Amino acid sequence: MLCLGIETSCDETAVALVENGKCIGSILGTQAPLHALFGGVVPELASREHYRCLGPLYDKLMEDAKVTLADLDVIAVTRGPGLLGALLVGLAFAKGLALASGKTLIGINHLHAHLLVAAIEEPIEYPALGLLVSGGHTHIYKIDAPDIFILLARTLDDAAGEACDKFAKMLGLPYPGGVIIDKLAQQGIPDPYLFPRPYIHNSELDFSFSGLKTSAAMYLKQYPQLIEEGQRYCSNNSKVAIKEELYNVCSSYLLAISETLYIKMERALQKYTNEIKTIIVAGGLAANSFVRQAMHNLAINYNKKILLPEQKLCTDNAVMIAYYGELLAEKGYCHRLDLSAIPRGQHIPDDMVKV
């Protein structure tokens, strides 16, 4: 089975081909330099860039892989969650291909795809406990099968990835700042008492990171020289000598986030410990060294198998869309052409048709 994947949920325009569980082609066009000028993603600009880039990227992918539209069995496209305008560009393109070719169309839940792409490298043993950590979402799922996801926890306010990007912005670092924070943090010595582990003094599995951001803002207000260090690093990058305090504060901040994720995942694991066979960590923040280490420690402590996608599969990509689309098609699922886009914050309906 050959599946085309299309991803346009935010600021990455991506297309990929997966055949029988293996990626045979993938192209990604990032808009990060454009949005960096504004300190974050501008939805209207993102939509226009998807519209400009998607067609040429598709043509190049098909040419490089030496396949045609007629060779495809399935067309999978992100239908949500994401920026509505951006989603509509990808959805319209996919529907056009499906209408012209008569191929199977499947709308993909972007969040579920993030978690299942780990299986492209190593099979998932179900049931699995999945942690999705990204700029827009922080969710814990119990995954009983590729088409059975049970949401156990979500963030009540800010996502973990957003908390990283906002901290980077406070320090005067460029967008997207999460990667830079991680790079700086790896050279620091974390202070485990500098920042709180938010929303842990309860029995809940849900997350809340707004208090951590507030704590960081208050700390930087006390020590404005850290902001000056961040701006110096930004202006001259690694060529300028940076004071160790900047490394240490970044390290302490990421330790607070990673330990919070550990605590909540441990609670979920204890609740289902006799059932869970695999821990999966996915999303953009799954590429963070502190998060990866914390989840490795969790898996070791509870003697569970852990799957962490390689870093290029942690951020938004079309490989995960094509891979998940193929899995669903093999189970007989598809969507009609009235498939709708679902923006962030709205429930994605279970409206697939089984044939």
Curated annotation (Swiss-Prot):
Protein localization: Cytoplasm
Family stated for the protein in its record: Belongs to the KAE1 / TsaD family.
Function: Required for the formation of a threonylcarbamoyl group on adenosine at position 37 (t(6)A37) in tRNAs that read codons beginning with adenine. Is involved in the transfer of the threonylcarbamoyl moiety of threonylcarbamoyl-AMP (TC-AMP) to the N6 group of A37, together with TsaE and TsaB. TsaD likely plays a direct catalytic role in this reaction.
Record text on cofactor binding: Binds 1 Fe(2+) ion per subunit.
Pfam families (UniProt xref): TsaD
GO cellular component: cytoplasm
Keywords: Acyltransferase, Cytoplasm, Iron, Metal-binding, Transferase, tRNA processing
Catalytic reaction annotation: L-threonylcarbamoyladenylate + adenosine(37) in tRNA = N(6)-L-threonylcarbamoyladenosine(37) in tRNA + AMP + H(+)
BP terms from Gene Ontology: tRNA threonylcarbamoyladenosine modification
Domain of life, source organism: Bacteria
Molecular-function annotations in GO: iron ion binding; N(6)-L-threonylcarbamoyladenine synthase activity
Sequence positions that bind substrate: L132, V133, S134, G135, G136, D165, G178, D182, N288
Residues that bind Fe cation: H110, H114, D316
Cofactors required: Fe(2+)
Protein name, per record: tRNA N6-adenosine threonylcarbamoyltransferase
The enzyme's E.C. designation: 2.3.1.234
